[in-house]
């Protein structure tokens, strides 16, 4: 997802590379996985969306249903964020296909992203396109629409990641990026601030699994009684982590090869 391909590489670059990744993996196992199981459990037990799940499951007199209101607000805010970033990516696919980025160096591509952010009209247009496409997929339902399309797109994503990772590792200077990405340097973590690194790793662990906002409760409501909640959660966490680590293995070495700051921020993947 976007949390892996777009956000994880620049978070790893910003917070010190391998040291950040180690802390991130610890939070995934200790907090991310259990919360994911819990959200699936709530969804499967209630067979309802986040808006009604806690109303149906809570004991009489309890106030767990208050979470549903915060959850719905969080999901709307999250979709505002996701649709904008997805719009950036769709726009870059169009720009690449149209040859607008052909022959440009990293500085020129970075300027191109800056100009995109300065154009509210362009960003709004591509965000609307993403929303329309998303509604089209969701209108088919989870199993007939989202599940089928996701299977095809995931296979394409994994194949693309494999090709790009191999190419990135063959670039001149890429091994310095691999060292930064895979060899922990706790000295740099102290310079950045241990608290900042821990908070960044924790927020990324929750963000990448889409937990805490109740969205996984919706998917849990479609899980059959024969499916293991722990097993499904482990599969999701492992695949999610694999994609994140591979995305970093593409972006970080390429940054060192082209002289781009690995912690350059949200525009890093577009450079």
Regions found by a protein language model. Name each.
Residues 1-27, 176, 214-220, 232-234, ...:
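Transmembrane helix-boundary motif of multi-pass solute transporters/channels
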Residues 2, 32-36, 44, 76-87, ...:
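Transmembrane alpha-helical segments of multi-pass membrane transport proteins and ion-pumping complexes
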Residues 11-15, 45-70, 83-143, 172-199, ...:
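Inter-helical loop and helix-membrane interface segments of multi-pass membrane transporters/permeases
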Residues 19-24, 56, 63-70, 227-236:
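Membrane-interface alpha-helices at helix entry/exit sites of multi-pass transporters
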Residues 23-59, 254, 258:
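Juxtamembrane transmembrane-helix boundary signature
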Residues 24-33, 74-97, 126-140, 155-168, ...:
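Hydrophobic core segments of alpha-helical transmembrane domains in multi-pass membrane transport
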Residues 28-40, 50-52, 130-139, 213-220:
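Central hydrophobic cores of alpha-helical transmembrane segments in multi-pass inner-membrane proteins
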Residues 147, 151-271:
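Membrane-embedded translocation segments of transport machinery
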